[in-house]
Protein backbone atom coordinates (compact mmCIF):
# COMPACT_ATOMS: atom_id res chain seq x y z
CA UNK A 1 0.00 0.00 0.00
CA UNK A 2 1.39 3.39 -0.97
CA UNK A 3 2.10 5.73 1.94
CA UNK A 4 0.29 9.06 1.48
CA UNK A 5 2.45 12.18 1.37
CA UNK A 6 1.86 14.82 4.03
CA UNK A 7 1.48 17.72 1.62
CA UNK A 8 -2.18 18.58 2.13
CA UNK A 9 -3.38 21.63 3.99
CA UNK A 10 -5.43 20.81 7.03
CA UNK A 11 -4.41 18.92 10.16
CA UNK A 12 -5.88 17.06 13.10
CA UNK A 13 -4.53 17.24 16.64
CA UNK A 14 -6.20 15.19 19.37
CA UNK A 15 -5.78 16.40 22.97
CA UNK A 16 -7.05 15.45 26.43
CA UNK A 17 -8.32 17.58 29.31
CA UNK A 18 -7.53 15.15 32.11
CA UNK A 19 -10.13 13.95 34.60
CA UNK A 20 -10.28 16.71 37.21
CA UNK A 21 -11.93 19.86 35.91
CA UNK A 22 -9.64 22.32 34.07
CA UNK A 23 -6.60 21.83 36.34
CA UNK A 24 -5.30 18.68 34.64
CA UNK A 25 -5.25 20.25 31.18
CA UNK A 26 -1.63 20.51 30.06
CA UNK A 27 -0.03 23.72 28.81
CA UNK A 28 0.60 21.97 25.50
CA UNK A 29 -3.06 21.04 25.14
CA UNK A 30 -4.18 24.58 25.93
CA UNK A 31 -1.80 26.05 23.34
CA UNK A 32 -3.22 23.84 20.59
CA UNK A 33 -6.82 24.67 21.52
CA UNK A 34 -6.03 28.38 21.32
CA UNK A 35 -4.25 28.07 17.97
CA UNK A 36 -6.82 25.84 16.23
CA UNK A 37 -9.05 26.97 13.37
CA UNK A 38 -11.84 24.83 14.81
CA UNK A 39 -12.26 22.86 18.05
CA UNK A 40 -14.47 19.82 18.66
CA UNK A 41 -14.83 18.69 22.26
CA UNK A 42 -16.33 15.87 24.32
CA UNK A 43 -15.92 16.54 28.04
CA UNK A 44 -17.91 15.51 31.09
CA UNK A 45 -18.05 18.59 33.29
CA UNK A 46 -19.53 21.99 32.40
CA UNK A 47 -16.68 23.99 33.95
CA UNK A 48 -14.16 22.45 31.55
CA UNK A 49 -16.58 23.02 28.67
CA UNK A 50 -16.98 26.68 29.62
CA UNK A 51 -13.20 27.06 29.92
CA UNK A 52 -12.65 25.62 26.43
CA UNK A 53 -15.17 28.08 25.00
CA UNK A 54 -13.12 30.98 26.40
CA UNK A 55 -10.01 29.77 24.55
CA UNK A 56 -11.37 29.48 21.00
CA UNK A 57 -14.26 31.19 19.21
CA UNK A 58 -15.18 28.22 17.00
CA UNK A 59 -16.07 25.21 19.16
CA UNK A 60 -18.49 22.31 18.60
CA UNK A 61 -19.78 19.96 21.32
CA UNK A 62 -19.46 16.32 20.23
CA UNK A 63 -21.64 15.15 23.12
CA UNK A 64 -24.70 16.01 21.02
CA UNK A 65 -24.14 12.83 18.99
CA UNK A 66 -25.01 10.57 21.94
CA UNK A 67 -28.65 9.54 22.41
CA UNK A 68 -30.68 7.12 24.50
CA UNK A 69 -30.54 3.62 23.04
CA UNK A 70 -28.19 4.71 20.26
CA UNK A 71 -25.21 2.49 19.47
CA UNK A 72 -22.06 4.00 20.88
CA UNK A 73 -20.16 2.84 17.80
CA UNK A 74 -22.53 4.86 15.59
CA UNK A 75 -21.89 7.88 17.80
CA UNK A 76 -18.13 7.39 17.60
CA UNK A 77 -18.25 7.14 13.80
CA UNK A 78 -20.19 10.40 13.61
CA UNK A 79 -17.86 12.17 16.05
CA UNK A 80 -14.80 11.26 14.03
CA UNK A 81 -16.42 12.16 10.72
CA UNK A 82 -17.49 15.68 11.68
CA UNK A 83 -13.88 16.42 12.65
CA UNK A 84 -12.53 14.90 9.42
CA UNK A 85 -14.89 17.00 7.27
CA UNK A 86 -13.25 20.16 8.60
CA UNK A 87 -9.74 18.76 8.17
CA UNK A 88 -10.56 18.00 4.52
CA UNK A 89 -11.55 21.66 4.09
CA UNK A 90 -7.97 22.61 4.96
CA UNK A 91 -8.55 23.66 8.57
CA UNK A 92 -6.26 22.96 11.52
CA UNK A 93 -8.66 21.01 13.73
CA UNK A 94 -8.28 20.08 17.40
CA UNK A 95 -10.36 17.29 18.94
CA UNK A 96 -10.65 17.51 22.72
CA UNK A 97 -11.61 14.49 24.84
CA UNK A 98 -11.65 14.14 28.61
CA UNK A 99 -8.94 12.10 30.30
CA UNK A 100 -6.20 10.83 28.03
CA UNK A 101 -7.65 11.16 24.51
CA UNK A 102 -6.45 7.72 23.43
CA UNK A 103 -7.37 5.68 26.52
CA UNK A 104 -10.83 4.09 26.27
CA UNK A 105 -11.65 6.54 23.48
CA UNK A 106 -12.63 5.29 20.01
CA UNK A 107 -13.47 8.36 17.86
CA UNK A 108 -10.10 10.00 18.49
CA UNK A 109 -8.16 6.97 17.29
CA UNK A 110 -10.49 6.42 14.33
CA UNK A 111 -10.20 10.03 13.18
CA UNK A 112 -6.41 10.01 13.53
CA UNK A 113 -6.02 6.81 11.51
CA UNK A 114 -8.25 8.07 8.69
CA UNK A 115 -6.60 11.50 8.61
CA UNK A 116 -3.15 9.92 8.33
CA UNK A 117 -4.32 7.49 5.64
CA UNK A 118 -5.60 10.46 3.59
CA UNK A 119 -2.27 12.29 3.82
CA UNK A 120 -3.07 14.87 6.49
CA UNK A 121 -0.84 15.76 9.40
CA UNK A 122 -2.32 14.14 12.49
CA UNK A 123 -1.06 13.54 16.00
CA UNK A 124 -2.25 12.87 19.53
CA UNK A 125 -1.01 14.69 22.62
CA UNK A 126 -0.99 12.83 25.96
CA UNK A 127 -3.37 13.70 28.76
CA UNK A 128 -4.02 12.67 32.36
CA UNK A 129 -6.06 9.45 32.34
CA UNK A 130 -8.25 7.91 35.03
CA UNK A 131 -5.50 5.32 35.45
CA UNK A 132 -2.96 8.07 36.15
CA UNK A 133 -5.32 9.45 38.80
CA UNK A 134 -5.73 5.97 40.29
CA UNK A 135 -1.97 5.51 40.61
CA UNK A 136 -1.73 8.83 42.43
CA UNK A 137 -4.77 8.46 44.68
CA UNK A 138 -4.08 4.85 45.69
CA UNK A 139 -0.30 5.43 45.86
CA UNK A 140 0.60 2.37 43.81
CA UNK A 141 3.44 1.93 41.34
CA UNK A 142 2.50 -0.04 38.20
CA UNK A 143 6.09 -1.25 37.87
CA UNK A 144 6.02 -2.92 41.28
CA UNK A 145 4.94 -5.67 40.85
CA UNK A 146 3.54 -5.04 37.34
CA UNK A 147 0.01 -4.16 36.26
CA UNK A 148 -2.79 -5.56 34.09
CA UNK A 149 -5.49 -3.22 32.76
CA UNK A 150 -8.69 -4.45 31.08
CA UNK A 151 -12.08 -3.18 30.04
CA UNK A 152 -14.63 -5.19 32.04
CA UNK A 153 -16.75 -6.55 29.18
CA UNK A 154 -13.68 -7.41 27.11
CA UNK A 155 -12.21 -9.17 30.15
CA UNK A 156 -15.23 -11.48 30.15
CA UNK A 157 -15.86 -11.89 26.42
CA UNK A 158 -12.30 -12.81 25.52
CA UNK A 159 -11.49 -14.58 28.78
CA UNK A 160 -8.49 -12.34 29.37
CA UNK A 161 -5.99 -13.92 31.77
CA UNK A 162 -5.36 -12.56 35.25
CA UNK A 163 -2.06 -12.46 37.11
CA UNK A 164 -2.50 -12.82 40.85
CA UNK A 165 1.04 -11.50 41.41
CA UNK A 166 0.34 -8.08 39.80
CA UNK A 167 -1.92 -5.07 40.20
CA UNK A 168 -5.21 -5.56 38.34
CA UNK A 169 -7.33 -2.63 37.09
CA UNK A 170 -10.79 -3.04 35.54
CA UNK A 171 -12.47 -0.14 33.75
CA UNK A 172 -16.14 0.33 32.85
CA UNK A 173 -17.34 -2.04 35.57
CA UNK A 174 -20.59 -0.05 35.74
CA UNK A 175 -21.71 -0.94 32.20
CA UNK A 176 -20.87 -4.62 31.78
CA UNK A 177 -22.16 -5.99 28.47
CA UNK A 178 -23.76 -2.68 27.42
CA UNK A 179 -23.07 -1.34 23.93
CA UNK A 180 -25.53 1.57 23.73
CA UNK A 181 -25.88 4.85 25.64
CA UNK A 182 -28.31 6.30 28.14
CA UNK A 183 -28.26 9.85 29.50
CA UNK A 184 -29.64 8.62 32.84
CA UNK A 185 -26.98 5.96 33.37
CA UNK A 186 -26.77 2.19 33.05
CA UNK A 187 -28.79 -0.54 34.73
CA UNK A 188 -25.73 -2.84 34.76
CA UNK A 189 -27.83 -5.99 35.00
CA UNK A 190 -24.93 -8.23 33.90
CA UNK A 191 -22.66 -7.10 36.75
CA UNK A 192 -23.03 -10.46 38.52
CA UNK A 193 -21.24 -12.22 35.65
CA UNK A 194 -18.19 -10.07 36.34
CA UNK A 195 -18.34 -10.86 40.06
CA UNK A 196 -18.50 -14.59 39.26
CA UNK A 197 -15.26 -14.35 37.30
CA UNK A 198 -13.49 -12.30 39.96
CA UNK A 199 -14.50 -14.74 42.69
CA UNK A 200 -13.22 -17.62 40.60
CA UNK A 201 -9.83 -15.94 40.16
CA UNK A 202 -9.32 -14.36 43.60
CA UNK A 203 -11.86 -15.75 46.05
CA UNK A 204 -14.72 -13.97 47.82
CA UNK A 205 -12.57 -12.58 50.65
CA UNK A 206 -9.93 -10.89 48.50
CA UNK A 207 -10.02 -7.06 48.64
CA UNK A 208 -11.22 -4.86 45.80
CA UNK A 209 -11.06 -1.06 45.74
CA UNK A 210 -14.01 0.77 44.21
CA UNK A 211 -12.36 3.85 42.72
CA UNK A 212 -13.75 7.04 41.18
CA UNK A 213 -11.35 9.88 40.38
CA UNK A 214 -12.29 13.36 41.58
CA UNK A 215 -13.81 15.41 38.77
CA UNK A 216 -14.08 18.76 40.57
CA UNK A 217 -11.33 20.58 42.49
CA UNK A 218 -13.22 20.50 45.80
CA UNK A 219 -14.01 16.78 45.60
CA UNK A 220 -12.10 13.85 47.06
CA UNK A 221 -11.68 10.62 45.09
CA UNK A 222 -13.75 7.58 46.01
CA UNK A 223 -11.46 4.85 47.38
CA UNK A 224 -13.80 2.36 49.03
CA UNK A 225 -12.20 -0.96 49.99
CA UNK A 226 -14.56 -3.93 49.90
CA UNK A 227 -14.22 -7.66 49.40
CA UNK A 228 -15.13 -9.29 46.11
CA UNK A 229 -17.90 -11.19 47.87
CA UNK A 230 -19.48 -7.92 49.04
CA UNK A 231 -20.00 -6.92 45.39
CA UNK A 232 -23.04 -9.22 45.37
CA UNK A 233 -24.80 -7.19 48.06
CA UNK A 234 -27.12 -4.35 46.92
CA UNK A 235 -25.59 -2.02 49.50
CA UNK A 236 -22.35 -2.18 47.53
CA UNK A 237 -23.13 -2.92 43.87
CA UNK A 238 -25.67 -0.08 43.65
CA UNK A 239 -22.78 2.34 44.27
CA UNK A 240 -20.99 1.11 41.15
CA UNK A 241 -21.67 3.48 38.23
CA UNK A 242 -20.55 4.47 34.77
CA UNK A 243 -17.31 6.12 35.95
CA UNK A 244 -16.39 3.42 38.49
CA UNK A 245 -13.12 1.51 38.26
CA UNK A 246 -11.99 -1.53 40.23
CA UNK A 247 -8.47 -1.95 41.56
CA UNK A 248 -7.61 -5.45 42.77
CA UNK A 249 -4.29 -5.79 44.60
CA UNK A 250 -2.00 -8.79 44.14
CA UNK A 251 -3.17 -11.96 45.86
CA UNK A 252 0.37 -13.19 46.41
CA UNK A 253 3.93 -11.97 45.97
CA UNK A 254 6.04 -14.01 43.60
CA UNK A 255 9.41 -15.05 44.98
CA UNK A 256 12.49 -13.91 43.13
CA UNK A 257 14.70 -16.26 41.13
CA UNK A 258 17.87 -16.54 43.20
CA UNK A 259 19.90 -17.94 40.30
CA UNK A 260 19.01 -14.94 38.11
CA UNK A 261 19.86 -12.53 40.95
CA UNK A 262 23.33 -14.06 41.11
CA UNK A 263 23.72 -14.13 37.32
CA UNK A 264 22.84 -10.42 37.12
CA UNK A 265 25.21 -9.73 40.05
CA UNK A 266 22.66 -7.63 41.90
CA UNK A 267 24.22 -8.49 45.28
CA UNK A 268 27.79 -8.63 46.61
CA UNK A 269 29.47 -12.02 46.47
CA UNK A 270 28.34 -14.28 49.29
CA UNK A 271 25.27 -12.26 50.29
CA UNK A 272 22.02 -14.23 50.41
CA UNK A 273 19.04 -12.45 48.76
CA UNK A 274 15.74 -11.95 50.59
CA UNK A 275 13.22 -13.66 48.33
CA UNK A 276 10.08 -12.14 49.85
CA UNK A 277 10.52 -8.74 51.52
CA UNK A 278 9.43 -5.66 49.57
CA UNK A 279 10.90 -2.17 49.63
CA UNK A 280 9.22 0.56 51.67
CA UNK A 281 6.45 1.75 51.49
CA UNK A 282 4.12 -1.26 51.38
CA UNK A 283 0.99 -1.39 49.24
CA UNK A 284 -1.70 -0.34 51.72
CA UNK A 285 -4.38 -2.24 49.77
CA UNK A 286 -2.52 -5.53 49.69
CA UNK A 287 -2.86 -7.97 52.61
CA UNK A 288 0.19 -9.29 54.46
CA UNK A 289 3.09 -7.87 52.47
CA UNK A 290 6.46 -8.34 54.25
CA UNK A 291 8.11 -4.91 54.02
CA UNK A 292 11.34 -3.37 55.26
CA UNK A 293 10.94 -0.58 57.87
CA UNK A 294 10.92 3.07 56.83
CA UNK A 295 14.12 3.70 58.80
CA UNK A 296 16.42 0.70 58.81
CA UNK A 297 20.21 0.65 59.06
CA UNK A 298 20.67 1.42 55.35
CA UNK A 299 18.28 4.38 55.50
CA UNK A 300 19.96 5.82 58.62
CA UNK A 301 23.36 5.55 56.93
CA UNK A 302 22.10 7.36 53.80
CA UNK A 303 20.45 10.11 55.86
CA UNK A 304 23.65 10.61 57.89
CA UNK A 305 25.48 11.61 54.70
CA UNK A 306 23.11 14.53 53.97
CA UNK A 307 24.86 17.05 56.22
CA UNK A 308 28.18 16.62 54.40
CA UNK A 309 26.77 16.23 50.89
CA UNK A 310 28.35 18.07 47.97
CA UNK A 311 27.25 17.75 44.32
CA UNK A 312 29.29 15.11 42.43
CA UNK A 313 31.81 16.06 39.77
CA UNK A 314 29.48 15.04 36.92
CA UNK A 315 26.47 16.98 38.24
CA UNK A 316 25.22 19.48 35.63
CA UNK A 317 23.71 22.70 37.06
CA UNK A 318 21.60 24.92 34.83
CA UNK A 319 23.54 27.71 33.10
CA UNK A 320 21.36 29.29 30.43
CA UNK A 321 20.22 32.73 29.33
CA UNK A 322 16.75 34.24 29.63
CA UNK A 323 16.61 34.37 25.82
CA UNK A 324 17.14 30.61 25.58
CA UNK A 325 14.59 29.95 28.32
CA UNK A 326 12.06 32.11 26.48
CA UNK A 327 12.61 30.51 23.08
CA UNK A 328 12.41 26.95 24.43
CA UNK A 329 9.17 27.88 26.21
CA UNK A 330 7.83 29.37 22.99
CA UNK A 331 8.64 26.20 21.03
CA UNK A 332 6.82 24.13 23.66
CA UNK A 333 3.69 26.29 23.84
CA UNK A 334 3.30 27.98 20.45
CA UNK A 335 2.37 25.53 17.65
CA UNK A 336 2.99 28.14 14.94
CA UNK A 337 6.49 28.94 16.22
CA UNK A 338 7.21 25.22 16.43
CA UNK A 339 6.16 24.77 12.80
CA UNK A 340 8.50 27.58 11.75
CA UNK A 341 11.39 26.01 13.64
CA UNK A 342 10.77 22.54 12.19
CA UNK A 343 10.70 24.03 8.68
CA UNK A 344 14.14 25.68 9.02
CA UNK A 345 16.20 25.31 12.20
CA UNK A 346 18.94 27.67 11.07
CA UNK A 347 16.70 30.51 9.93
CA UNK A 348 14.69 30.33 13.14
CA UNK A 349 17.82 30.28 15.32
CA UNK A 350 19.24 33.31 13.51
CA UNK A 351 16.01 35.24 14.14
CA UNK A 352 16.21 34.92 17.94
CA UNK A 353 18.05 37.83 19.64
CA UNK A 354 20.33 37.71 22.70
CA UNK A 355 21.30 34.02 22.53
CA UNK A 356 24.84 32.96 23.34
CA UNK A 357 26.83 31.45 20.48
CA UNK A 358 26.47 27.98 21.98
CA UNK A 359 22.71 28.37 22.43
CA UNK A 360 22.28 29.51 18.85
CA UNK A 361 24.34 26.56 17.61
CA UNK A 362 22.22 24.17 19.67
CA UNK A 363 19.04 25.61 18.13
CA UNK A 364 20.49 25.19 14.65
CA UNK A 365 21.42 21.57 15.36
CA UNK A 366 18.19 20.68 17.14
CA UNK A 367 19.61 17.67 18.98
CA UNK A 368 18.71 16.99 22.64
CA UNK A 369 22.36 16.51 23.61
CA UNK A 370 23.30 19.81 21.96
CA UNK A 371 20.53 21.57 23.92
CA UNK A 372 21.75 20.01 27.14
CA UNK A 373 25.34 21.07 26.53
CA UNK A 374 24.26 24.64 25.72
CA UNK A 375 21.91 25.04 28.69
CA UNK A 376 23.84 23.14 31.37
CA UNK A 377 27.28 23.55 32.89
CA UNK A 378 28.84 20.35 31.59
CA UNK A 379 31.93 18.85 33.29
CA UNK A 380 34.88 18.13 31.01
CA UNK A 381 35.00 14.43 31.93
CA UNK A 382 31.39 13.91 30.88
CA UNK A 383 31.89 15.70 27.57
CA UNK A 384 35.03 13.68 26.86
CA UNK A 385 33.15 10.43 27.47
CA UNK A 386 30.25 11.60 25.32
CA UNK A 387 32.59 12.65 22.52
CA UNK A 388 34.24 9.23 22.47
CA UNK A 389 30.95 7.30 22.39
CA UNK A 390 29.50 9.59 19.71
CA UNK A 391 32.60 9.31 17.53
CA UNK A 392 32.36 5.53 17.76
CA UNK A 393 28.70 5.68 16.76
CA UNK A 394 29.52 8.05 13.90
CA UNK A 395 32.11 5.61 12.55
CA UNK A 396 29.31 3.03 12.36
CA UNK A 397 27.16 5.36 10.26
CA UNK A 398 24.83 6.83 12.90
CA UNK A 399 23.90 10.54 12.53
CA UNK A 400 25.28 11.74 15.88
CA UNK A 401 26.20 15.23 17.00
CA UNK A 402 29.90 15.37 17.94
CA UNK A 403 30.46 17.34 21.14
CA UNK A 404 33.96 18.72 21.75
CA UNK A 405 35.42 18.25 25.23
CA UNK A 406 35.33 21.85 26.43
CA UNK A 407 32.96 22.83 29.23
CA UNK A 408 29.87 24.58 27.85
CA UNK A 409 31.06 24.59 24.23
CA UNK A 410 29.14 22.69 21.57
CA UNK A 411 30.77 21.70 18.32
CA UNK A 412 28.57 21.84 15.27
CA UNK A 413 30.13 18.83 13.57
CA UNK A 414 27.31 16.69 12.25
CA UNK A 415 27.93 13.43 10.44
CA UNK A 416 25.90 12.73 7.34
CA UNK A 417 22.68 10.81 7.95
Curated annotation (Swiss-Prot):
A Gene Ontology biological process term: methylation
Biotech use, per record: Lentinulin A displays strong and selective activity against the plant-pathogenic nematode Meloidogyne incognita but shows no further phytotoxic, antibacterial, or antifungal activities.
Amino acids binding S-adenosyl-L-methionine: 98, 100, 103, 130, 172, 213, 244-245
Domain notes: Within the homodimer, the clasp domain wraps around the adjacent subunit to position the core peptide into the other subunit's active site for iterative intermolecular methylation.
Protein name per UniProt: Methyltransferase/ribosomally synthesized cyclic peptide lentinulin A precursor ledMA
Positions carrying N-methylisoleucine: 401
Region annotated Precursor leader, chain positions: 379-399
Function of the molecule: Fusion protein of the methyltransferase ledM and the lentinulin A core peptide; part of the gene cluster that mediates the biosynthesis of lentinulin A, a highly methylated cyclic dodecapeptide with nematodicidal activity. Lentinulin A derives from the C-terminus of the ledMA protein, and it is the ledMA protein that methylates its own C-terminus using S-adenosyl methionine (SAM). The C-terminus is subsequently cleaved off and macrocyclized by the prolyloligopeptidase ledP to give the final product.
Modification sites for N-methylglycine: 405, 408, 411
Species of the source: Lentinula edodes
Region Methyltransferase domain, residue ranges: 1-251
Annotated EC: 2.1.1.-
EC class of the enzyme, as a word: transferase
Active site: 72, 76, 98
Entry-linked CDD domains: OphMA_like
Coiled-coil segments on the chain, per record: none
Pathway info: Mycotoxin biosynthesis
Keyword annotations: Methylation, Methyltransferase, S-adenosyl-L-methionine, Transferase, Virulence
A Pfam family of this chain: TP_methylase
Annotated family: In the N-terminal section; belongs to the precorrin methyltransferase family.
Annotated region described as Clasp domain, given as residue ranges: 252-378
Subunit structure: Homodimer.
InterPro entries registered for this protein in UniProt: 4pyrrol_Mease (IPR000878), 4pyrrol_Methylase_sf (IPR035996), 4pyrrole_Mease_sub1 (IPR014777)
Residue(s) carrying N-methylvaline: 403-404, 406-407, 410, 413
Any one GO molecular function term: methyltransferase activity
Record note on modification: LedMA automethylates at Ile-401, Val-403, Val-404, Gly-405, Val-406, Val-407, Gly-408, Val-410, Gly-411 and Val-413 before being processed by the prolyloligopeptidase ledP which likely forms a peptidyl ester upon removal of the follower propeptide, which then undergoes macrocyclization with the N-terminus of the modified core peptide. Peptide backbone alpha-N-methylations change the physicochemical properties of amide bonds to provide structural constraints and other favorable characteristics including biological membrane permeability to peptides.
Amino acid sequence: METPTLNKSGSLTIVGTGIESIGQMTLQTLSYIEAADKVFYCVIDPATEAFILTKNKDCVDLYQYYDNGKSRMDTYTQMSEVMLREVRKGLDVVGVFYGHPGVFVNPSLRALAIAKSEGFKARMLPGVSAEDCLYADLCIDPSNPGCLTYEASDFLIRERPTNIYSHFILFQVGCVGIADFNFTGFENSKFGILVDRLEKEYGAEHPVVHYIAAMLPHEDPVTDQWTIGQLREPEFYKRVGGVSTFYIPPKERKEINVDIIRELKFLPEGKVPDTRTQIYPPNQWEPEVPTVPAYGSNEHAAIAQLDTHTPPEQYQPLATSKAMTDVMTKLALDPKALAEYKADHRAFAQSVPDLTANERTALEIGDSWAFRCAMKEMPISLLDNAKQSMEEASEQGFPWIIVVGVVGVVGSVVSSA
